[in-house]
A protein has these predicted regions:
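Pyridoxal 5′-phosphate
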Residues: 1-251
Length: 251
């Protein structure tokens, strides 16, 4: 068994990536990226350059370089999430971005008053949606998702109707790791005339994502987990091109 494992390690085309991270203990097998990604060595160099040159030496002149970083960094995230340039913006944190997009989605569907999510969604996502529902006088419908099996498209179909404005779900379940059918569920939501908002916090950087290919409307995600951007790193949001001139910033 050990020989087989050693051979798999030796043949792994990604094995060399370990040397790109500040992992001092060679015996450490770090599998907690869902909580906090490891520190890339390149980040140490970039942070030193940013602090010494961009801030320390260039001072206010660096604003000219920094001002469009949210969009440029967003396009890099777009490469991970299957989003064409100009649709992803790095900003704020996941909770704030979820609040902004959910409110904008409700405003974009006047006459509809239902938000759909599931009871196994990440707690802070549920708290935001509960708060918005209370503020707006909307109805929040909770799917009773099987924790181990994950989201069932048939349950989503049964929960949405002509009153549904928004469906907000996690692409990967934070407790079980269950992967949702992004394309199938998004299509069901669109058939009901509602908007689809995906939380990518536990999938970005870990599994393939194709936001444009799945016809997703909106998405949010963080960068400190599998993207390895570090504690306190800003989150990101995605707004599909067809909605950019439709949605309005609520704050």
């Amino acid at each position: 068994m050990r020989e087989h494992a050693d051979k798999l390690d030796a043949d792994d085309p990604l094995a060399g990536f370990r040397d790109r991270f500040a992992l001092d203990d060679p015996s450490l097998v770090y599998l907690n990226g869902n909580s906090l990604g490891a520190l890339p060595l390149a980040t140490l160099r970039r942070m030193d350059s940013m602090l010494r040159q961009e801030w320390g030496t260039a001072l206010a002149r660096s604003w000219d370089h920094w001002v469009d970083l949210p969009g440029r960094a967003g396009d890099v995230i777009g490469e991970l999430t299957g989003a064409a340039p100009g649709q992803v913006l790095v900003a704020d944190n996941t909770t704030v971005n979820l609040y902004k997009l959910a409110c904008a989605a409700l405003d974009a569907r006047p006459g509809r008053h239902v938000i759909v999510t599931d009871r196994d969604n990440f707690p802070s996502d549920r708290y935001v949606l509960e708060g918005i529902a209370a503020q707006r006088g909307a109805e929040l419908r909770m799917l009773d998702t099987d924790i181990d099996e994950g989201l069932d498209p048939a349950e989503v179909r049964a929960a949405v109707d002509e009153d549904t404005a928004l469906v907000s779900l996690s692409h990967v379940a934070y407790r079980s790791g269950a992967l949702a059918d992004m394309a199938g569920i998004t299509a069901i939501v669109h058939q009901a005339g509602a908007l689809m908002l995906w939380d990518l916090c536990h999938s970005v950087g870990a599994v393939p994502i194709d936001l444009d290919g799945c016809d997703v409307d909106l998405a949010v995600g963080c960068t400190y987990k599998y993207v390895n951007a570090g504690p306190g790193a800003p989150a990101f949001l995605y707004v599909c091109a067809r909605l950019r001139e439709v949605l309005r910033q609520p704050i």
